[in-house]
Amino acid sequence: MEEVAREEVEIDKDLRRKIKKTVKKILESSNLYKITEIKAREEASLKLDLDLSQDPYKVIVKEEVENFLEEAVKLIGNKLAMLPKRIESTSI
């Protein structure tokens, strides 16, 4: 049985950093209720003039979107934890 060789695309660190930075800027300026990974990837593709819909670019975008959302959730959780606790009144 023949093995099918998969072509691995190497991405240099500068390009990887540029993709992540572009995606992050897009997410920071977007309504997180409306933006999707696909929309972020398409917008980043236009800004970078690069097809990000194929691996390994697609994986980089997915990871950056996930990282961004995880950080946003942590930030919201931290801010909620700093709010004063609501004091329940008891009736006598």
Swiss-Prot record:
InterPro entries, sorted: DEK_C (IPR014876)
Keywords in alphabetical order: Nucleus
Pfam families (alphabetical): DEK_C
PROSITE patterns, A to Z: DEK_C
Residue ranges of domain DEK-C in the record: 13-70
UniProt key word Ion transport: no
Protein's UniProt keywords contain Nucleus: yes
Subcellular location field: Nucleus
Cellular component annotations (GO), alphabetically ordered: mediator complex
Highest taxon in the source lineage: Eukaryota
Assembly and binders: Associated with the Mediator complex.
Protein name: Mediator-associated protein 3
Organism (species): Arabidopsis thaliana
